[in-house]
């Protein structure tokens, strides 16, 4: 599913304030000098590239999962269009408190860090999954390239036990090394496409690459959910369904999944550091361990249906972690912290 931009709900009210930095544009719009589309193009644009960790989906029956995968938008730690409470205190809601902007949600269920042109399996095709290369391609095709790009993808790439030969299941070291290196190479290839295009823009572009989530603490919460289900089978009714999609989530394979995720995060960190020396002056590229260090050890952070994806509270934890490391990116784009906490907007 291709991304559909979401504009801040109160953006006209915000920029109608004479103190707003976008007020001159608002006057031009009100006087009929520019269209609403042209006015919106002047607002900061924030994009999210990712997998199901960045969406509000969860797994249940095949057809229900299929329907949610195709229709679920704006219900995650990045973007939530529901009122709060009881909605999610998403990154977008936090940003909306101090600047109007346009959110571009590219993330989707089942997305992989892939080799461009790689054929997808049947399951991903019917879900219309957009892998990393496809999501990057979507952004490159936009008429208004984003100012801020958040990237959190690769969680489906650490399913090391999937189709693993028996010998590698018992001695997985070479497989883990091979998978982490392959992910880095594919990730770097797509980052080069993204950065090359960003360098041609006439505005600053900040890219923030998040490490994979803290799987060690995540599985602590998952183990609690499993015990609860043992005591009451009505809890987490689709908890075991997880294993149909991610073999490595089985208890016997988790420790090496945790190892692989850490290896991947080190590869991503190194890749970002090595790329920084080659950037154009209008680009900032950073690695963040905010999600990799977030405490996900409570069962209530898991969705009550599948015990796999995040619950509303889980999305709140991820949102807070992700937002906490945005400061340097926002400052690069001209957003500064005000005297009383939060941030204030400067020109993009």
Describe the role of every protein-language-model region:
Residues 219-286, 312:
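Substrate-gating cap/lid alpha-helix
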Residues 55-57, 112-115, 157-161, 215-221, ...:
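Short catalytic/ligand-binding loop motif for oxyanion handling, primarily in non-cytosolic enzymes
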Residues 1-102, 145, 329-348:
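N-terminal secretory targeting modules
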Residues 100, 198-205:
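A short helix->loop->beta-strand "cap" motif at the edges of active sites that frequently abuts
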Residues 45-57, 102-107, 147-152, 157-159, ...:
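Structural recognition of the beta-strand scaffold that forms the well-ordered cores
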Residues 263-270, 274, 283, 288-334:
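Extracellular low-complexity, Gly/Ser/Thr-rich intrinsically disordered linkers
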Residues 49-63, 211-235:
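Short, solvent-exposed beta-strand-terminating loops
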Residues 64-192:
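Conserved SGNH/GDSL esterase-like catalytic core that processes O-acyl groups on lipids
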